């Protein structure tokens, strides 16, 4: 007699009958369209006392942002922030270019110093 025989294999359970838990089938067509229609409107939510709407892929404050700053002010600040970031990137690029120029000039200066030292040594040997 095997140690682990058929004692441990359970019987297969019969499949369950599908019973709809929804009462949508009992509603008439107009009520279903009203409840589940395609016109959902814009999604809105209230978060920390602030009403937000989902427009064009972004959550936007419905009226006034907490702290008294309105929508136009935030747009102006975002635009100014974008301008400052672009200016910052341009200035970083200029600094990188200037550092490259400085390192190139320094390398050329060291090469010329070496050449000058070698010429001095050869000139002293001739005398």
Curated annotation (Swiss-Prot):
Gene Ontology CC: one annotated term: ciliary basal body
Subunit structure: Homodimer. Homodimerization is essential for nuclear localization and interaction with KPNA4 but is dispensable for interaction with CTNNB1. Interacts with polycystin-2/PKD2 and GM130. Interacts with the C-terminal region of CTNNB1. Interacts (C-terminus) with TCIM (C-terminus), TCIM competes with CTNNB1 for the interaction with CBY1. Interacts with FAM92A; this interaction facilitates targeting of FAM92A to cilium basal body. Interacts with CIBAR2. Interacts with KPNA4.
Family: Belongs to the chibby family.
Further information: 'Chibby' is Japanese for 'small'; the gene was so named for the RNAi phenotype seen in flies.
Gene: Cby1
Protein name as catalogued: Protein chibby homolog 1
Superkingdom of this protein's organism: Eukaryota
Function comment: Inhibits the Wnt/Wingless pathway by binding to CTNNB1/beta-catenin and inhibiting beta-catenin-mediated transcriptional activation through competition with TCF/LEF transcription factors. Has also been shown to play a role in regulating the intracellular trafficking of polycystin-2/PKD2 and possibly of other intracellular proteins. Promotes adipocyte and cardiomyocyte differentiation.
Modified residues (Phosphoserine): 9, 20
Gene Ontology biological process terms in this record: canonical Wnt signaling pathway; cardiac muscle cell differentiation; cilium assembly; fat cell differentiation; floor plate development; negative regulation of canonical Wnt signaling pathway; negative regulation of DNA-templated transcription; negative regulation of Wnt signaling pathway
UniProt keyword terms in alphabetical order: Cell projection, Cilium, Cilium biogenesis/degradation, Coiled coil, Cytoplasm, Cytoskeleton, Differentiation, Flagellum, Golgi apparatus, Nucleus, Phosphoprotein
Coiled-coil intervals: 68-110
GO molecular function, one term: protein homodimerization activity
Localization: Nucleus speckle; Cytoplasm, Cytoskeleton, Cilium basal body; Cytoplasm, Cytoskeleton, Microtubule organizing center, Centrosome, Centriole; Golgi apparatus
Segments for region (Leucine-zipper): 77-98
Main location: nucleus
Region (Minimal region for the interaction with PKD2): 60-112
Region ranges (Disordered): 1-25
């Amino acid at each position: 007699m095997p140690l682990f025989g058929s004692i441990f294999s359970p019987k297969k359970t019969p499949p369950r009958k599908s019973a709809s838990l929804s009462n949508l089938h009992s509603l008439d067509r107009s009520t279903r369209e009203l409840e589940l229609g395609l016109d959902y409107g814009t999604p809105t939510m209230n978060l920390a006392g602030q009403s937000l709407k989902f427009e064009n892929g972004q959550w936007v404050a419905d009226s006034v942002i907490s702290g008294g700053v309105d929508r136009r002010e935030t747009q102006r600040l975002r635009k100014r922030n974008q301008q400052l970031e672009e200016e910052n990137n341009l200035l970083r690029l200029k600094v990188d270019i200037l550092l490259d120029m400085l390192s190139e000039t320094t390398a050329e200066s060291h090469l010329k110093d070496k050449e000058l030292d070698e010429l001095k040594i050869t000139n002293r040997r001739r005398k």
